[in-house]
Regions:
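Small/polar-rich, solvent-exposed N-terminal microdomains that initiate assembly or binding
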Residues: 1-49, 83-94
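Oligomerization/assembly interface segments of phage tail-like spikes and tubes
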Residues: 51-69, 74-76, 114-126
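Short amphipathic alpha-helices in soluble, non-transmembrane regions
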Residues: 7-10, 72-79
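Short, solvent-exposed beta-strand/turn "edge" segments of beta-rich domains on protein surfaces
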Residues: 45-52, 109-111
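Acidic-leaning, charged glycine-interspersed low-complexity segments
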Residues: 81-129
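Acidic/proline-rich low-complexity IDRs
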Residues: 10-13, 59, 103, 127
């Protein structure tokens, strides 16, 4: 399970009902929060066989109103920054820390909805055992 998938589950547990790891059709959700994994970089291999590294996740919030997009994006950033990450290892990956960037306006999408987003860097331990 990727950090984006884990973060989506954590956000869903906090009550966000419109979280996706791939952009949905507007027919499915007209105001989605999309978390996309950008890449994994291994920092070290541990003595116990696990790997420690960083996974960058792009978070994009899409809303009909500019103020709604900004407020939702700032709330998502705050909630990810303060989240309690599951202690168990889902699918071999465990999030141990997250650093979030500043939410910024990202313009509008093709249908005129407002976009706000930020990048988050997850420190992840991968267990292959």
């Amino acid at each position: 399970m990727s950090a984006a998938e884990t973060a989506a589950e954590v956000l869903a547990g906090l009550g966000y009902t419109n979280v996706f790891t791939t952009p949905p059709s507007a027919l499915v959700c007209c105001e989605p929060i999309v978390l996309s994994s950008v890449g994994w970089e291994r920092e070290s291999r541990q003595a116990d066989g696990t790997e420690r590294g960083r996974e960058r996740v792009r978070v994009l919030v899409c809303c009909d109103g500019a103020a709604d997009a900004e407020a939702t994006c700032r709330a998502v950033e705050r909630d990810l920054r303060h989240a309690v990450w599951p202690a168990g290892c889902a699918g071999g990956e465990r999030v141990v820390a997250v650093d979030t960037g500043m939410p910024l306006a990202a313009g509008r999408d093709g249908s005129g909805r407002w976009l706000w987003g930020f990048d988050a860097t997850f420190t992840v331990v991968r267990d292959f055992g």
